[in-house]
Structures are given as structure tokens and as C-alpha cells.
Amino acid sequence: MPLSRKNILCNIEIADGDAYLDYIQIPDGSMNITTQFAYSGLDADVTVTLQQSLDCKNFDDVATILLDKDNTSSTVNVLDVLTIWIRYRIVVGAAHTGTISECNLIFN
């Protein structure tokens, strides 16, 4: 299966609290997802959870990635995900400042 890319400009302000990225439909036949988040100015670590759904209504957690306040990007590879829809849940926790600027994805 050829690679498929998606770039999402998030511009999520941590000060606004917990958030979700929009739903993303997985390309047909894709089972592996690589996600890289770009961010800046975090004053505490932030948690991002990949969720999956077959009906785009009921989402379940698959994997969690930590956005380390001392870095500016974080990448996770999730293998063997058989689903139609995904979304990302962002939990700011103790963080009050910073921005998540981009979410870059590769599917295969």
C-alpha cells in the first residue's frame, strides 16, 4: 500500500483547555499510523490520545503520546489499527501555556 500523508494545522492554545482534533477518515487499506505533533511554549507536559471508531460516534482509546515540555515535537507509530475513523484527544493537565501548531500523519 502506498503512503498517504495528511498535514493538519492545529493552532491549539493550551490556555483554552482540553480539546479534540477533527475526525480523520483513514485511507482504505491503511493499518499503520505515524503521527508527529509540533508544539512550542509548553509549561508542563501535555497528553494526546489517539482514539478510533467504526461509526464516527463512539471513540475508544488506542495509544497515548506525551508532549514533553522540554521538546518541540513528539512522534508515535501505531501499528495494526483496523478502523475507519480516528481523532486525537488533547488533555492539558497542569499546562497553562503553549501552542500545538501541527499534526503530521502518514498512513500505510
What are the residue ranges of the model-derived segments?
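Noncatalytic modules at the cell exterior or secretory-pathway interfaces
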Residues: 30-37, 80-98
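Solvent-exposed serine/threonine-rich low-complexity stretches and specific carbohydrate-binding patches
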Residues: 8-12, 61-70
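Tryptophan-centered short beta-strand motifs
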Residues: 20-23, 56-64
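Transition segment at domain starts
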Residues: 1-30
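Conserved Ser/Thr-centered positions that define the repeating blades of beta-propeller domains
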Residues: 51-53
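Short glycine/proline-centered coil/turn motifs in the loop regions
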Residues: 42-44
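Exposed aromatic-hydrophobic patches
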Residues: 21-25, 73-80
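Edge beta-strands of jelly-roll/beta-sandwich modules across compartments, strongly enriched
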Residues: 95-108
